[in-house]
């Protein structure tokens, strides 16, 4: 199992700045995670997801490129 920031097809973290309070929890559960939250009101962070779920990494960041 892994944890981390959800990543969209564009390589960017899932934004939650203007989303409802339960948005990240729902998105994490859709990916079989057990919980999640909106970190600093900026991006969705998830816990206990399957290892195959893509998460953001500084080393592989391609957001904005």
From Swiss-Prot:
Residue span(s) of domain LCN-type CS-alpha/beta: 2-64
Gene3D superfamilies named among the record's database cross-references: Knottin, scorpion toxin-like
GO BP, sorted A to Z: defense response
One MF annotation (Gene Ontology) recorded for this entry: sodium channel inhibitor activity
Family, as annotated: Belongs to the long (4 C-C) scorpion toxin superfamily. Sodium channel inhibitor family.
Function of the molecule: Beta toxins bind voltage-independently at site-4 of sodium channels (Nav) and shift the voltage of activation toward more negative potentials thereby affecting sodium channel activation and promoting spontaneous and repetitive firing. This toxin is lethal to mice.
Name recorded for this polypeptide: Beta-mammal toxin Tpa2
Species the sequence originates in: Tityus pachyurus
Organism lineage string: Eukaryota, Metazoa, Ecdysozoa, Arthropoda, Chelicerata
